[in-house]
Amino acid sequence: MEGVRQKCRPKHQVLVLKCYPQYQKGVQVVKPNSSELSYLLYYVSTRRSKLTKVGAFLEKRAARDVWRRKIGNVQVTLQILSALIEKVPRDLPIYARSVMTVLETVVRSQDISMVEDSIETFETFCRHQDMAALSAEQDFATQYREVVRSYAGFAEGDPSTQSKLAAGPPLTVRWKTAGLRAIKGVVSSEAGLAADGGDSIRVILPVILENLYSPEDNLVGSLELKLLEADKNESETAHRRRVSTATVETVDAVEGDASLAAQNTADMDRKAEMDMRLLALRCLEQIVVNGSSRGQIRVTTQVVLDFILRKSRVTGNGLGHNHKDSWATSLIELIAKWCPVQVRFIILVAAMDILHDIPPTEESLDESFAITYLIDRLLKSPVNMIGLSVIDVLLGLLRHMSFLISPSRAGKSTPDEKQNGHSNALELSVKRTEVLSLLQDCIGNLTTHIYYGEQVVDMVRTILTRFRPSRGNEQAITSSPTQSDVLGGASAMISSGEDGLIAFSLPNAKITALRAIKNILLVANTKRPGFTVTTESRHQVGLYVWEGTQWLLSEPDRDVRYAYVDAFLTWLNLETSTDDLKVKERTGRPASQPAKNDLSDPTERPGKRTASMSGNQREKVILIAQSNFLRLLHLTIFDLATDHPTSVSEITLLHLLLVSLVKHLGVNAVRFGLPMVLKLQDNMTTGDGQSFPALVNIGSLVYGYLWALSEKFDLDTSRIGNGIQSEVQKRQQLGVWLETIRLPPVNLDKIIHNSNVQASGRGAQDVSLLIPFDGGEELIQRIEASYGSFITLLTHSPPSSPGSVGSPPRSITAPVLPHVSASAATPKANVLPPAVREQMLSPWSREACLAAAENERAEAKSLSRSRTGTLVMRNHVHQNGTSSPSASSNASVPQSAYASAAGLQNAQRTSVPNSSGSQLISTSRESPVHVNELRRVLSVNEEGKARRMSPLRGRLDGSNRSVISSSSDSMVSGYSLSEFDDGASVKPQSTRGGRISLDGEETPKASALSFMADTNDIPPVPPIPPSISIQGGLTDGRQRSVSASRPSTAPGPRRPSVTNGKAGTPSTSPGRSLSRDKSRSSTGLAAAATDGVEPNAEKIDSARLDVQKLLDGFLSPADAETRGSRRKARSNTGRRGVSGGLGRPPY
């Protein structure tokens, strides 16, 4: 019967059965018969219909062998499946279910030997599996996940998935190793992880982390070193020399380990466990390295952070400030290091999402602290996260901080508290205070890596624009202008809704945010030797970011005032430089004051002024914001000194602030501070009802400020300086001086510590001893002289020199001062601007200060409207050429501070003004030629791109004849200072007649509408072809060229002098006609060209060659090289003879 049964079997079953060899019991490894297996593979590869039948038969065979515990037959079945997958991988979806069924049968056997044998087949399947089939067939996908989950259960140590005999540690490690080997096969296939949307990661990653977890802090670090060492050994083994066949080696010599041979079983168990953990780390590395998709990295990060939180809840060992390195921090930094650079920032984004999901209750503070601590470690680690949205992370941290402080979010508010508004209703616990302190550090560490130039500026401004006054300080806000809308007011910054408004009205929120600003400045100015130098150098945080925050100095809460002063003093110490000691005047020339050498007619000036003014609008708005802040800050100081004259701590704090302003800002602060201090003195001396301690304190504050001015501007040797020093010493000797007023001023920490200490006993209480200061005019003269000496020293010192006063150089790109090149060489630059001097001499009043602040705020708004109205419209007409960066702003972009946290309504960052580009000056009839026009037109070598201009040009009057000179000074005289304006980064096109020219900015064409203004005027003349010229004449004045690379001081070629529009010596020689591309003279004036006959190139004489060689020297090398290919002879006759071309053409 058996023979009959075998003959009745199908051929595929016969071929499969022939692969099983005859073996004896006790054999460890059984392999299929090689020849029969080869024939079976050939049979199924040529007959695809047999694949399903072979798979089904192997399923039955494996089930019977597993039930009978025939491990050898199971090994053969698994090897047949592996060979089948490698032979016909394209047809794997046909028999994939059979493979999964066999593996599932083996896994359920709970036999460690069978499970270990099945791993190789599973790895082969993972390498060749089809993701489309895995995603399309739900039943097959479910079966695949069950197999993966079974293997993960082995690695997890789940007793339900392991044999009951697995009682000893060696067998447990063996089970875990088997499971991790299978998991490595899953994670090694990038497609396998991405196919199921992260479900496999959620199954296997906790198992991997469980095998990596250890209370030891340095376990991950030691495993990483072993992993690197193992990779190095593998690479060395791969390149190992071949062993000679004559050398006889024993098995022990090849595979033995002498160190292991000398150890006991416990040591070997520890080594096996370490190898198991190392395998788990390899699996984690494969997940992270292969996670090129953002979704996969996000899922990985979420699973890791959830595991860390779960372990911290179970063990009770949370993270804290005293934990420098822990298992969790080492793991998260290692993952960030392995992660691909382009998706590394997803780790922080996922961590922020988890932080937002944690409720700000007292029970969840440990989780909030743990996630924030891990974020902080990532931010201050050497790992650079390119692509990270710093402002989004900052806003997320600020939002979480507001949730922690807000009573409603913390669940502590009552209906009565909601009706009474926000007070300090929420008492901060110790743990909540620790979380807030960690948030401060986390915000500061955001500046560890600089990703763009305006990063620090944007961060500081983002925080400052979110403050709201408390109920007791609303009068301080309503009585003074708030932040300028042009620089992005606070109202434009709030994006988190009502919660942000509530939280940032609380004193605790203000204190935490101000301390975070201090941390930002400290970290940004800290040099870390272990970090790589960033390619992006950051910009200096300007004074304008503090605009609208002066009311924080008058907050009812004392800690808020101290935190504000601390943050502002930190900015003064770290972000100011020598440039901040200079007085920065507003650039640009009013419309009623034309340039000294500007010879253009009135129709030409508005366009030029618009270009210049638009380029300087940013600087003007910044200067307005700076002056407004200093004006209102000194007004706040005046109010505080008037309201609290007897408070020693307040007067000392104001003295520290005033002295620091003078030290770091110089005349920029004195112009507002000196009139205010003198007014404060007048109010104290003329007011009635003032107590004697108040008079002493205010007098000490006034003379302390004058003392600081004397020290700052080196007035000790002058009469006014000696008088100030004498008065201070006399008051100190008589006991009518506040002891805390001294130079250098008292430290802020000492002021805070002694805030409740009152002044000691006074001396003789005689008001006549307090002599007021009355030498204001002489003091201002001495300050002006000292400032002039400082500017002179600074001008003649090297650029890298810090000057006489200033902070040491830092790695900050300072803003470019406008018009330095034009004004530094003139003696007038060493004199204090008249407006500043007049401001210091004029009397000060609170009403005038508020009115001036309101006027400047209105001016800033008008500048913003003009920029978004006219100039932005012009910025859209650049259709060709290279557009200026500042000219590419879009008028449709919302004017919000989040789009530009520095506050200016353009797409560029706003600290450093743009100075690139040259002006475009619109031309018209009756106007002389400007050299900038020549440079612009003739910078284009192609004839087709040359600007076409009408030859109509008015007769030159006597005022213009001085320009027509053949000397080297003629070109310099043709320039005006406005043409050297480096602030004209915006290049507007001509908009005459209400229409916009759509020509390119590099080669704009004259609009035809400019010649049609008056129909009764001279009719238009078509442009002369560039290839036609006349004998002895000059090319058209609109087409002459001066190379853009030619220096402005280069000598021009000699030409005959001109009198009354006629040339003294007519140039009618045939050899003296010039090409269109040659520059005639430094003024560039020429006669109109006429149509002519094709010239003869052989009639060029030596004189013409000499002139051409001379002109070639004035042009750039690129222009000179192209002259030979385009050089043509000129005609001997023309339509009209021209003897100089300086008059109006006779039509």
Swiss-Prot record:
- Region of interest (Disordered), residue spans: 582-615, 877-929, 942-1097, 1114-1147
Q: Where is the composition biased (Polar residues)?
A: 903-926, 1057-1072
Q: Could you name the Gene Ontology cellular component terms for this entry? A: plasma membrane
Gly residues compositional bias: what residue ranges?
Answer: 1137-1147
Q: Which GO terms describe its biological process?
A: protein localization to plasma membrane
Comp. bias regions, Low complexity:
883-897, 959-978
Q: What is this protein called?
A: Protein efr3
Q: Which gene encodes it?
A: efr3
